[in-house]
């Protein structure tokens, strides 16, 4: 199994009374509450954690969120460029550039190709539809975003795999009459492609495309439904290399330390998910028409759970509840290993463990200790991945 270190690089230092008054802690919270000197320290610490991962053989993840306390990584291509140059051996996953918010997929493909070349073929590309507040801060139209998501992926893939001169693209959402990026990708035909999603319909489409399906903080039950939909619709006998599971995770010397420090990661759920209704359930086009009426109610009626954001059910949970629901793994190395394997068995296996090892008030020293214990005491015991027979591994350009 491959482990991927995920650091949100959050900004948890806004006074609680400000957060309590704010209708949303994303998109609309004034940036006067973010001290750039503190932000500089956070960037340095988080990037150093990625370099530690490079020493220990733990792959790294670059994420992208905008305009809020939940993450300072608003410019994923810049982080990718830094990691591509500074790391030397591990894989780098972009999870990812928000393609439904960015207006130009060709530019995104160009950024990915450049990072792949700088890293000498260590890039993995992850796509994200984007959250509600991202649509607002990105000045994007949420109507038709699912179709736009798939067309952007198609255009990016064609851009990365075309090497015989310019081509033109006439799509429903994107038009490019001259596409011909330099440099081309280092890996051929293109770097491995992922998508972070949780609904079975999208997972089924990922299965048909042979992409890696990543489930982020969805728990074993929802993840199994998505993975099963992938298996039923996609490649025959897909291996575990097509599945990724992301979980809040902290490994301590003892169960007491692991749980105490790991509980700090729940800040991400309990504080940084707060959004105003106009940036969530009242945002047009984000919810199927048949669920809209129920979604607008103050309290959804029975049977209307599909209209809620998956994140809504995570706000306010305790560490014990999060562990029971497969959202958090915390304890000593033996305990965390057992927790991971319990999730592994429930979902039917996965080859990629994305462990969110730093968020909230969990500090740099604690994060580095957790990374070391994960790399040395837990990762070597996790099962090897199984490969998908029909999958052609990416290779370096000749």
Mark where each language-model region is.
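N-terminal beta1-alpha1-beta2 module of alpha/beta enzyme domains
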Residues: 1-93, 191, 393-398
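Hydrophobic faces of well-ordered beta-strands that scaffold small-molecule active sites
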Residues: 3-7, 61-63, 92-95, 123-127, ...
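An alpha-helical appendage that flanks or caps ligand/catalytic pockets
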Residues: 4-37, 55, 146-182, 222-347, ...
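Acidic (Asp/Glu)-rich catalytic clusters
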Residues: 54-55, 80-89, 112-123, 204-208, ...
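Glycine-rich, proline-tolerant flexible connector loops at the mouths of alpha/beta enzymes
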Residues: 60-83, 99, 136, 217-218, ...
């Amino acid at each position: 199994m491959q482990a991927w270190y995920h650091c949100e690089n959050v900004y948890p230092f806004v006074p609680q009374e400000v957060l309590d008054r704010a209708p949303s802690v994303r998109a609309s919270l004034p940036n006067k509450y973010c001290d750039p000197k503190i932000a500089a320290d956070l960037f340095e610490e988080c990037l150093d954690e990625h370099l530690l991962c490079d020493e220990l053989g733990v792959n790294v993840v670059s994420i992208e969120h905008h305009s809020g306390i939940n993450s300072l990584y608003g410019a994923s291509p810049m982080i990718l460029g830094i990691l591509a140059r500074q790391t030397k051996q591990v894989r780098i996953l972009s999870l990812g550039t928000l393609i439904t918010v960015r207006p130009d997929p060709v530019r995104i493909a160009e950024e990915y190709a450049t990072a792949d070349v700088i890293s000498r073929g260590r890039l993995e590309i992850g796509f994200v539809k984007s959250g509600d507040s991202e649509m607002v801060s990105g000045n994007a139209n949420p109507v038709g975003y699912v179709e736009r998501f798939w067309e952007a992926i198609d255009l990016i893939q064609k851009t990365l795999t075309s090497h015989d001169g310019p081509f033109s693209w006439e799509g429903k959402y994107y038009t490019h009459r001259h596409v011909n990026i330099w440099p081309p990708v280092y890996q051929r035909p293109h770097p491995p492609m992922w998508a972070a999603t949780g609904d079975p319909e999208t997972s089924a489409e990922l299965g048909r495309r042979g992409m890696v399906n990543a489930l982020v903080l969805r728990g074993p039950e929802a993840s199994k439904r998505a993975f099963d939909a992938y298996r039923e619709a996609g490649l025959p006998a897909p291996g575990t290399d097509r599945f990724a599971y992301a979980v809040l995770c902290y490994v301590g010397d003892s169960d007491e330390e692991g749980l105490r420090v790991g509980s700090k990661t729940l800040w991400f759920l309990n504080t940084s998910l707060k959004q105003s209704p106009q940036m969530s359930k009242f945002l047009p086009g984000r919810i199927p028409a048949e669920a809209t009426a129920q979604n607008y109610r103050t309290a959804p009626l029975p049977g209307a759970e599909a209209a809620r954001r998956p994140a809504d059910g995570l706000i306010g949970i305790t560490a014990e509840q999060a562990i029971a629901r497969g959202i958090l793994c915390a304890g000593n190395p033996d305990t965390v290993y057992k927790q991971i394997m319990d999730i592994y068995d429930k979902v039917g296996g996965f080859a990629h463990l994305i462990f969110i090892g730093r968020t909230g008030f969990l500090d740099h020293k604690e994060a580095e200790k957790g990374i070391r214990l994960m790399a040395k005491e837990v990762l070597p015991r996790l099962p090897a991945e199984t490969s998908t027979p029909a999958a052609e591994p990416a290779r370096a350009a000749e």
